[in-house]
Amino acid sequence: MTRAPELEACLDRLWGRRDVHHVAMAVRSGDGALDWRGARGDVRPGGPALTTETPYFVASIDKLVTSTALFVLAERGALDLDGRLSEYLDPARVRGLHVARGVDRTDEITLRHLVSHTSGLADYLEDRPKGGLSLIEETLQRGDAGWTVDEALERVRERLRPHFPPQVPHDPGAKVQYSDTNFLLLKAVLEAVTERSVADVYRERVFAPLGMRDTFVVSRDDPHSERMANVAALWAGAEPLDAPVTLRSTYGMFSTLNDQLALVRGVVEGRPFEGGRATFERMATPFRRFGQGFDRAALRRPGWPIEYAHGVMRFRLPRWLAPFDRPPAVVGHTGSTGTWVFHCPDRDLDLVGTVDQVTAGPVPFRSLGAWLRATRRSAPNRVADG
């Protein structure tokens, strides 16, 4: 591993935040000259110590995995990204998900709408019904609870409203609104097309080709109770969050720093795809910028100036926000619990990590500039982990 005191300082600053109880992060260059990992804090209250090999919940980084599996199947002819959702799932199952002013536009929604967040569908997890709490707020306030895919869809149908009509799919100026409903539906599509579980699809189409041996998915049918006993705790403010039933309902994914490095590098280089890097380039085109949200949910989900393509984020600050030391752009994905996988093309760097805090979704974006500056000053001396 590489000795990197500047990155150690970044790690310590994150751990020093009042809302961060542990942190694990890694940075590696394409040529291996910089290869650093570090961890601080305990796995859970009372120990043991968190290590750079401890599995953790990756949150919405699973969207990058879902998109990768989708593109693998598309280039093999198993599905068509421009095919309608109702061609892959029972029309009765999805009917009424996108109704505005009495008009049901659900049948216009394609898989491409879902994977690019241009469907306009409400977010079953984060959006609030009129006079009520979001599903994630209910979980945080009332305790662990579970639901089926169809129960989540019924919530969208009966209690929430779409944000905008389904957009013109290939229009670079199309509206984009982050919604967990989009990718919940895509997971159902993956299962319908392959007649396999989501976990099996991920394992066969993504994890195995990329050598991700320590990544697993929990679900209502496959709880992985023994493996869950060893994962890093999630936190909600000052309290640990024990929500195994909720995590199984969302097909929660757990991984390690090493596997997340393998994921971001492998996808960017196109290793799972028959078309190689050219397929990834299609995933990453076009990028559209999220709008500015002003509701409570906007504090947790990605917004301006983050851009989105097909399950891939890009983050680059507008020049007017950083006129003198603008950090280079990164692509990858983040999660609402303060998780990140970033690839920086200009520096050929991969950056991954977690703070496991449900209030820390913005942390990766706020810290990225400091991390990239630290990598410029890091000397390639070979030593142990941080």
Model-found features: residue ranges?
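Catalytic loop of the DD-peptidase/beta-lactamase superfamily, centered on the K-T-G motif
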Residues: M1-D42, E53-F57, E87, A174, ...
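Short secondary-structure junction motifs
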Residues: V20-H22, R76, D80-D82, G173
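Active-site helix/loop module of the DD-peptidase/beta-lactamase fold
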Residues: T52, F57-I61, E75-P129, A188, ...
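Active/ligand-binding-proximal structured segments within catalytic/core domains
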Residues: V65-T66
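A generic structural signal for nonpolar/aromatic side chains embedded in well-ordered alpha-helices
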Residues: L114-V115, V156-R157, M283, T375
